[in-house]
Amino acid sequence: MGAKYREEDDFIYCKVTLFTECKYAIQNFNMELRVDRRKIGFSQALQDTAAWWERFENLSPAYVPVIAKKPLYSTWYQFHQDLEVQKLLEECRLAKSLGFESIIIDDGWQTEDNNRGYDFTGDWESERFADFGHLVNQIRDIGLKVGIWYSVPFCGKKSKAYQKFKGKFLTENHRWAPVFDPRYPEIRDYLVSIYVKAAKDWNLDGFKLDFIDDFKAYPDTSFEPHNGRDFSSINEAVDALLMQASVELKKINPEMFIEFRQKYTGPAMRKYGNMLRAFDCPGDAVMNR
């Protein structure tokens, strides 16, 4: 679903696309489309739409912890992948003094490779920091809650996971890295086990689960019946993956925050994510609103 404004005729053109995975049989479906024609402000219409979403039992939003509404520092804008302990701790002290309450350690914690690629994603071992748990405790001692970043769909060709799950990808031709196929239960279990282990081993407060929208059909994605898959639909498999991750992480810490970005938020994503970011827009007050 989307909309765009056309200056030439002063109209807003809307579109709704159905059956984007039209590769397998569908017996029945139903949908509800809300069109708000009231003369009210845009923000009020959105607020009322969110309340409407919440009426649907299968779209009940996740619990939102207090920390999700507090200022958060992300290392991406300052460091990109080039993370260094002492500089990071200095930034944490400064952030705390300015009123920040949490930090997301973004891309770079999992590898010493600074080439802004995803060749080594998939294993998620903290190569850069000898004792990542100790670093997390140091940051917590400063007074910040700590979450870490994962590019959920990607499995780099230089990772051990790539060899382990060979043949279980939606595509191997993505510009960043091969994309896991969540229709395989072992893929979902593997990914969730990584997050659960990290939460326990490092005493984490949250996760940034990135690139969820790259779980989709690609030109080379197979929809042929396969005994190893327990879903035909990619969307339904992603729903199962994220629900499983959310449930397991909140068993460890009921106040766990799970961050998504606006590009792939919506009524379904509110079931799992409880911290929603506008986009990659540092220093942009308008976009951040």
Go through each PLM region and give its residues.
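Residues at alpha-helix termini
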Residues: 13, 19-21, 97, 141, ...
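N-terminal accessory beta-strand-rich subdomains and adjacent acidic, glycine-rich linkers
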Residues: 1-55, 59
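Short conserved micro-motifs at the rims of enzyme active sites and ligand-binding pockets
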Residues: 44-45, 83-85, 270-271
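Aromatic- and carboxylate-enriched substrate-binding clefts and catalytic-loop regions
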Residues: 104-289
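Hydrophobic side chains in beta-strands
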Residues: 33-35, 75, 260
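An acidic-aromatic substrate-binding cleft motif
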Residues: 52-94, 98-102, 106, 110-111
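A generic structural signal for short, non-catalytic loop/turn and secondary-structure boundary residues
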Residues: 7-9, 26, 66, 141, ...
